Curated annotation (Swiss-Prot):
This is UPF0502 protein PFLU_2135. PANTHER family: UPF0502 PROTEIN YCEH (PTHR38768:SF1). Belongs to the UPF0502 family. It comes from Pseudomonas fluorescens (strain SBW25). The lineage of its organism: Bacteria, Pseudomonadati, Pseudomonadota, Gammaproteobacteria, Pseudomonadales. It comes from the Bacteria. HAMAP family: UPF0502.
Amino acid sequence: MTAEHDTDTPEPRLNSTEIRILGCLIEKQATNPETYPLTLNALVLACNQKTSREPVMNLSQGQVGQSLRVLEGQGFTRLVMGSRADRWEHRVDKALELVPAQVILTGLLFLRGPQTVNELLTRSGRMHDFEDAEQVVHQLERLIARGLALLVPRQAGQREDRYTHALGDPADIEVIIAARGSPVERGAGSGVSVERIEELEARIALLEERLAKLEPL
């Protein structure tokens, strides 16, 4: 089978903890390859980051560990035995037969929910080299064609359509979409551009990653 194989088999549904775990593993593989795969401790820290996460979560080691085992059974994660500590890696690319660009977009949708094309282009900057928004749209359309993503039409007060992943519980997805239907977009009328906010969030995320490396793993 190729990475672009189309299938009518329904993909497994993931809960919010499993989605967060996979999103973090995808992100850290791309942004911190020197510390990837992740120890359980490092993964918990990544899951509970205060930036680049929507919503912010407060997961315990027990919750993350249990979910990792479930994901392992579904072929989404793999335990890598080590001399000092066991580590975990994702296998989203193999489980869902995705090319690298699709893995990155899926990871971003896992971490931050419905997003515009421009948000995805900006936020993927440290993880994948998309040439322009058209490349992002092309890969999103391929994910939609396979039932792995959804187009969310712009709602009242919003200027752009959004995209979200389609691997969670349908009811949860509807709640997230409804919550994002606020009449005022982030940054609108605040005097601070969305691009500036994204830049600051990226800096904070980088600092949190450096701090995580100093934590005992």
